[in-house]
Amino acid sequence: MKVRSSVKKICTKCRLIRRKGTVMVICTNPKHKQRQG
């Protein structure tokens, strides 16, 4: 899980979602998991 100030989609399978006010990227590739904070 990467914690970044700006989260971006890395590949086409990345999905931007909001969980409890936090922007997250979920993907089939675990390396692409990101969280804003």
Swiss-Prot record:
Matching entries from InterPro entries are given as:
Ribosomal_bL36, Ribosomal_bL36_sp
What SUPFAM superfamilies does the annotation carry?
Answer: Ribosomal protein L36 (SSF57840)
| Keywords recorded for this protein, A-Z | Chloroplast, Plastid, Ribonucleoprotein, Ribosomal protein
One Pfam family, please name it: Ribosomal_L36
Q: Which GO terms describe its molecular function?
A: structural constituent of ribosome
Q: Does the keyword DNA-binding apply?
A: no
User: Which terms under GO biological process does the entry name?
Assistant: translation
| Main location as per UniProt | plastid
> Would the keyword Ribosomal protein be found if you checked this record's keyword annotation?
yes
Q: Where in the cell is it found?
A: Plastid, Chloroplast
Q: Which PANTHER family match?
A: 50S RIBOSOMAL PROTEIN L36, CHLOROPLASTIC, LARGE RIBOSOMAL SUBUNIT PROTEIN BL36C
Q: Which HAMAP family match?
A: Ribosomal_bL36
- Give the UniProt family note: Belongs to the bacterial ribosomal protein bL36 family.
User: What is the protein's name according to its record?
Assistant: Large ribosomal subunit protein bL36c
Name its species: Tetradesmus obliquus (Green alga)
Taxonomically, what lineage is the organism? Eukaryota, Viridiplantae, Chlorophyta, core chlorophytes, Chlorophyceae
Which gene produces this protein?
Answer: rpl36
